[in-house]
């Protein structure tokens, strides 16, 4: 399986909108409200912040499979709350269970390391099945509450 990263253009944000508004894709996000509205009138500001203003605090890319089809997104950003860089990976529901999540997480960790980041974190809902993926990829439990588990990986 071959995955490549792709820096989306503004007009490519239809894919992010599709994922965020898809109930099955966003089921992992139920602890934080599930689906997320991403209307076109918010695209410019979002794109400016995540793509144009590259200050080293954020990274965002789509994942494309060997056929050139968008299958998900990977990102990280600095969190003042956690005092560290938080991972984000979303695989569109119809492309799950095909290894894209594992490969995307590996790519994200490699990019973060290349960009000088030493630790990557993610706070995941306690019942999210993706926890096992993160643990298999070298993340360790930092702590947990009744709602979330905070995972950390030294890069």
Model-identified regions with their sequence ranges:
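A short, well-structured alpha-helix characteristic of acyl/acetyltransferase catalytic modules
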Residues: 1-40, 44
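Short strand-connecting beta-turns/loops that link adjacent beta-strands
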Residues: 10, 67-69, 79-82, 127, ...
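Amphipathic alpha-helical recognition patches that constitute DNA-binding helices
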Residues: 15, 86, 90, 103-104, ...
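Acetyl-CoA-dependent GNAT
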Residues: 36-86, 92-94
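Conserved beta-strand-loop-alpha-helix junction that forms the acyl-donor binding cleft
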Residues: 92, 121-132
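Conserved acetyl-CoA-binding loop-helix of GNAT-fold acetyltransferases
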Residues: 97-110, 132, 136
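Conserved catalytic-core motifs of GNAT/GCN5-like acyltransferases
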Residues: 121-125, 138-153
